[in-house]
Design a protein with these regions (language model features):
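Class II aminoacyl-tRNA synthetase-like tRNA-binding/catalytic domains
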Residues: 1-107, 118, 148-152, 169
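Metal-assisted phosphate- and nucleotidyl-transfer catalytic regions
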Residues: 35-41, 116-173
Length: 173
């Protein structure tokens, strides 16, 4: 059933990162200031303090503070909350995985992510996956050749003309 599968997958993710010497951390989900992704937060009133607080939209800033503080390899599997629309692709409460490693670049973390995806696929008798790494701009250019793409409209054009048609495992940079 889905609950057991989810538990096994999360356990596999933890083992994968532990074998790479990452430390699992847990960062606050109740924050005095909104931080992280450009998303609308849920708010709540903290009665004891008489102040409004926010449920986190992403753990990114808290995790990066740990990096600056000397934690070299960290990951978190945790809940995030976004007070926005709901769809087949978006749920206001969701679990995410974020991992960071000091002294590396995005290409190193892309490699770790590709290894993780294949580790999970092979762990559950799936195939080894060929994962393509391609820029959002290049995908948009392929989808609508000749169209002018600017930084301002890139994400919107991607969501309309590219994302619905991505089938194979793809890392969009």
């Amino acid at each position: 059933n889905v609950i057991k599968q989810r538990s096994l997958i999360i356990r596999s993710i933890r083992r994968f990162f532990e074998e790479l010497y990452f430390i699992e951390v847990e960062t606050p989900t109740l924050l005095s200031v909104n931080s992280g992704a450009n998303a609308k937060p849920f708010t709540t009133h903290y009665n004891a303090l008489g102040e409004d607080f926010f449920l986190r939209v992403a753990p990114e800033l808290s995790l990066k503070k740990l990096l600056v503080g000397g934690m070299e390899r960290i990951f978190e599997i945790g809940k995030n909350y976004r007070n926005e629309g709901m769809s087949k692709r978006h749920n206001p409460e969701f679990t995410s995985l974020e991992a960071y490693s000091a002294y590396t670049d995005c290409n190193s973390m892309i490699k770790v992510f590709m290894e993780l995806v294949n580790h999970l696929s092979l762990s559950y008798d799936g195939p080894e996956l060929k994962i393509e790494v391609i820029s959002m701009k290049d995908l948009v250019r392929q989808a609508i050749s000749g169209a002018e793409v600017t930084y301002e409209n890139l994400n919107e054009v991607f969501e309309i003309y590219v994302a619905p048609f991505l089938i194979n495992p793809t890392i969009v940079t």
